[in-house]
Amino acid sequence: MQEKKEEDLQQVLNNVSEVGIDEVGRGSIFGPVFSAVVELTEKNKFTLKKLGVTDSKKLTPKKRKLLLPKILLLSSDYGIGQSSAREIDKLGIRVATELSMIRALKKLKKKPSELLVDGPLLLRPWKGTQKNIESGDSKFISIASASIVAKVSRDNLMVRLERKYSGYLIFKNKGYGTREHLSLIKKNGITKLHRKSFLKKSNLI
């Protein structure tokens, strides 16, 4: 009888899934905004929590890189999407972020029955059930995992883009508007991957 209960519990832990989505790069002034969605069973949520998965902003770059392959291995499914700087300038950051999320969701094998979205805003194009959770990346392992996948994926792209767009220390600032980055824009001008709509607000172009 006890063995049967344990088998039933294991079945629940293996079958019940949580799907979380998060974005990174929303406030950057260079390059795309990235989104990632991750599906996890209850069992694998516990495993990742023990390994130290939490909000990507609370982890060192080294820790995020170490956790990424573990998340991908233990996820039932995942997807990554992005929207370019041009799309951000054309559509606005909220719509472009939503577009990157939808692109990530389209890479899943099946539509989730419920989606956990980090932050207070609805994912307006999504027709399924969703829950918005402020600071969700600190509360739900699926969202935290998505934040790590998105962050490492985008950071890796920034390092690669440094080879083509040198002179802005993109590998270091990851496209964010640090004082050093803004100073280099004044010195070298802007590239086609800089978000013009963001820079106009700062009177940099």
From Swiss-Prot:
Its cofactor is Mn(2+); Mg(2+). It catalyses: Endonucleolytic cleavage to 5'-phosphomonoester. GO terms for molecular function: manganese ion binding; RNA binding; RNA-DNA hybrid ribonuclease activity. The keyword Ribonucleoprotein does not apply. Its EC number is 3.1.26.4. Belongs to the RNase HII family. It comes from the Bacteria. Pfam families: RNase_HII (PF01351). Manganese or magnesium. Binds 1 divalent metal ion per monomer in the absence of substrate. May bind a second metal ion after substrate binding. Keywords: Cytoplasm, Endonuclease, Hydrolase, Manganese, Metal-binding, Nuclease. Endonuclease that specifically degrades the RNA of RNA-DNA hybrids. A divalent metal cation binds at D22, E23, D118. It is found in: Cytoplasm. One of its GO terms (biological process) is mismatch repair. The keyword S-adenosyl-L-methionine does not apply. One of its GO terms (cellular component) is ribonuclease H2 complex. The lineage of its organism: Bacteria, Bacillati, Cyanobacteriota, Cyanophyceae, Synechococcales. Residues 16-205 form the RNase H type-2 domain. It comes from Prochlorococcus marinus (strain MIT 9301). Its main location: cytoplasm. SUPFAM superfamilies: Ribonuclease H-like (SSF53098). It is an enzyme of class 3 (hydrolase). This is Ribonuclease HII.
